[in-house]
Design a protein with these regions (language model features):
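Active-site loop segments of alpha/beta catalytic cores
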Residues: 2-204
Length: 204
C-alpha cells in the first residue's frame, strides 16, 4: 500500500477564530502510530529486531507531519500543533533512554525545528511517567508538555526541576477526582495544580 499523502484535501482540521491563538491537532505521532500498526508486543521488540525499518517508518512519518505543519500554517494560520505520543506507563517509560535517544529524539527534534522555523509551537500530549525524557524534550525545544499525569510523577518535584524551561499544560486527576470526587475535591485539585505549577509570567 502507498504511504498516505499529506496533500489530501481537508486533511488539516479546522482551528479557532483568527483573533485567538490557533492550535491544530494530530494524534498518533511515532510510538502510537507504530504500535497501532504492529501491536504493542511487536512494537517494543521491533526496536531490537528491525531497527532499520523503524527508522524508515519514523522518517516517513516525520516527513508527513512536517508537511502537516506547512499546511497548518498556510491554510489555517496556525500558531501551534498539538500532537500525541504516549511513551510512558503508570510506573515508568515504555523503553530506555537509549531507545528514546536513538529512535525518537532525532525525529521529534526535526518536527520541532520545522515548527519553530514556521513560527509555530509544538504541544505534546504524553500519558504516563516520562520524567526520564523531560531533559531531552526540553533540550530539543519542545514548547508545551501535557498532562504530567497524576500518580505517575511527583508534581511538586517536576515543577521545581523543570519549571521555567518548558510550559506545563497540567491535567486534572481523571482517574479518581473527576469521575468520583465531590465538587469540593475538584476545587481542591484545581487549587493544588495552580499552587504547584503557576508562574509569575502567567504560564503554567
Amino acid at each position: 500500500a502507498d504511504f498516505p499523502s499529506a496533500e489530501y484535501p481537508g486533511l488539516i482540521p479546522q482551528a479557532g477564530p483568527k483573533s485567538r491563538y490557533r492550535l491544530i491537532h494530530w494524534w498518533y505521532w511515532l510510538f502510537e502510530r507504530l504500535w497501532s500498526l504492529r501491536g504493542m508486543e511487536n512494537a517494543l521488540m521491533d526496536f531490537y529486531l528491525y531497527p532499520g525499518q523503524i527508522h524508515q517508518l519514523f522518517d516517513k512519518l516525520t516527513d508527513f507531519y512536517c508537511r502537516v505543519l506547512e499546511r497548518g500554517k498556510s491554510e489555517r494560520a496556525a500558531d501551534g500543533l498539538f500532537i500525541s505520543d504516549d511513551i510512558g506507563t503508570q510506573k515508568g517509560p515504555f523503553f530506555s533512554l537509549d531507545i528514546f535517544r536513538e529512535f525518537f529524539k532525532p525525529y521529534y527534534k526535526r518536527l520541532i525545528d520545522k515548527a519553530h522555523a514556521l513560527d509555530m509551537h509544538v504541544w505534546m500530549h504524553t500519558c504516563g511517567n516520562i520524567e526520564l525524557f523531560l531533559p531531552d524534550l526540553i533540550e530539543i525545544g519542545l514548547d508545551v508538555i501535557h498532562p504530567i499525569q497524576k500518580y505517575t510523577m511527583d508534581e511538586a518535584e517536576i515543577a521545581k526541576k523543570f519549571g521555567g524551561q518548558i510550559t506545563f499544560w497540567v491535567g486534572f486527576d481523571v482517574q479518581q477526582i473527576i469521575p468520583y470526587g465531590t465538587p469540593q475535591e475538584v476545587a481542591q485539585e484545581v487549587r493544588h495544580l495552580v499552587d504547584t505549577f503557576a508562574r509569575k509570567d502567567g504560564r503554567f
